[in-house]
Regions:
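Extracellular/surface-associated beta-sandwich interaction domains
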Residues: 1-187
């Protein structure tokens, strides 16, 4: 929705960049459990102001799935366990039979990550001396003291940081979903 392929001029030729996508199904995801895919790379993200990504969620084989039961996340850092930023977004489920772009790709499912939010939560973590633990912040960058019982807000990012990640040295990115309910989910 509203995305156009980036064009790069090379040797008097205009080359269109490839559009990338990923589709996967997750079933029997237990409470608080997460699954994702990752890509190793070497990237310096300091030159970017925002990262945007469109996410779609749907029921799988008529199994029940309600809005907010699955949460999409993007984790980026020098590793996936000790030094990373994480951004989460609760997912709105696309109704069966939807064919309009805005129904398939609802606004609430669009990651729009301001890079300065990541630098601000890192500064807060340094000031509080709490970078060793996974620490969560809401969309207004206020500390969430009990993330497991604080509900996600539709259409709003939830940020997290652990360790000492650097936007200048991103070596791995993970994209996935986690179960935000007390039941198993599938989607």
């Amino acid at each position: 929705p509203g995305v156009y392929r980036e064009q790069i001029n090379q040797n008097n030729t205009i080359v269109s960049q490839n559009e990338q996508s990923l589709s996967y199904t997750v079933c029997d995801l237990n409470t608080g459990d997460a699954r994702g895919v990752y890509k190793n790379l070497n990237a310096d993200l300091r030159q970017y102001k925002r990262i945007k990504m469109f996410v779609h969620a749907e029921r799988y084989k008529n199994q029940p799935l309600a809005d907010g039961e699955m949460v999409a996340f993007v984790r980026l850092g020098s590793d996936l366990s000790e030094n990373f930023y994480q951004v989460e977004l609760p997912l709105q489920v696309t109704p069966a039979g939807a064919y309009l772009a805005d129904a398939i790709w609802p606004t609430q499912n669009r990651f729009d990550i301001p890079m300065d939010a990541l630098t601000q939560i890192k500064a807060k973590g340094i000031n509080s001396g709490n970078l060793a633990n996974l620490t969560y912040y809401d969309a207004a960058l206020n500390l969430i003291s009990s993330p497991s019982i604080t509900p996600h807000v539709a259409g709003q990012n939830r940020y997290a940081i652990k360790g000492n990640p650097s936007l200048a040295d991103i070596q791995v990115i993970m994209v996935g979903v986690k179960n935000a309910t007390s039941n198993q989910v599938c989607g």
